């Protein structure tokens, strides 16, 4: 059905139809030329203004758009390519390839607006998703089909952890990943693509980008584009998929811009009144079903470090685990720079992970906490003033700190050390030995940047020689 553009206000476009009213979320296509260049713009219906007038949000820049242009309602929401052919490619919000690679014919396309799995389809089992990263698996394990918040400032290693997870899912779980770049820097998107190419994980991941310079419609809907691709892998191929959203805050931010442009009355701190329901709609689709699972890792930017800001606060309600990266740990040269005392997980429960895992994780945290409490005394009076018992705690804590570091596969290029994947059993056994004092006689440095405890012993032997 054809309509006519009647008003253009930046990313908001009004379209008049004759004897037809497109549904909410239906896609409308406009083809026009600007200075001889053919352009195609996709609009999405956001509001009905009358019996045959709709207000839409543009999915790309509306430069050159003018009143009186013809617009065609496509009769369905935006649909994007799905299936194995999307791996190794970069897409925009409407499912067009933007990596300047070979054009591709995609047989299957799915709508980006989908219902979450029904109660009957959802899996209720609490299972751990093994990542092969010691600090994560031991202290803040991820739930299969769960949601993880990744917190950290600039340059502490968020991207490296994301790439390592993609690598481990690809090579150890034989699974696929989807990365949605939501309102982040174009340079970061480019770097990520090139780094993935270099580290050999690109053909196991689909990338969808809606960057900072794009209109709010594209930045908001790009999360749904990526999620739709992940849902296909889960529902049709029965796989366990990893879904990365960087950054989930920008999803709320772009929703707030759209809401203001559509003339809705703002809510707390200027956010959209529908913030919680929009977030819920997205997060409810990320879950385990009886066929497969989508486990998501979402980078969370906290504006002005205010955790009570409505955007991050709304995200917290959905998270099963948090992985907090700490600059002071990165400064010690310990990577991944995960904060062992501030990272949390609802999976760290004796009924889920078992009594032994729980005890050792809590034991490790207790030793690290005691060390933290003693640091002021050490700084003022020195180690010699501590009791023998406290000295032992400090020695073990330093070994634990070092042993929480590990060489990554994707960082081989700049560390020169081969990457390590450590199974949960080996991780538990290693830390159990440290807590029980089995390795009290080994030098601290033997624990730094190694995989399993056997490597610590081998390294200690080498150091003796």
From Swiss-Prot:
Enzyme class: translocase
Binding site for ATP: 152-159
Enzyme nomenclature, EC number: 7.1.2.2
HAMAP family linked: ATP_synth_beta_bact
Natural source organism: Campylobacter hominis (strain ATCC BAA-381 / DSM 21671 / CCUG 45161 / LMG 19568 / NCTC 13146 / CH001A)
Source organism phylogeny: Bacteria, Pseudomonadati, Campylobacterota, Epsilonproteobacteria, Campylobacterales
Superkingdom of the source species: Bacteria
Keyword line: ATP synthesis, ATP-binding, Cell inner membrane, Cell membrane, CF(1), Hydrogen ion transport, Ion transport, Membrane, Nucleotide-binding, Translocase, Transport
NCBIfam families in UniProt: atpD
Alphabetized Pfam families for the sequence: ATP-synt_ab, ATP-synt_ab_N, ATP-synt_VA_C
Main location: membrane
Name the record gives this protein: ATP synthase subunit beta
A Gene Ontology cellular-component term: proton-transporting ATP synthase complex
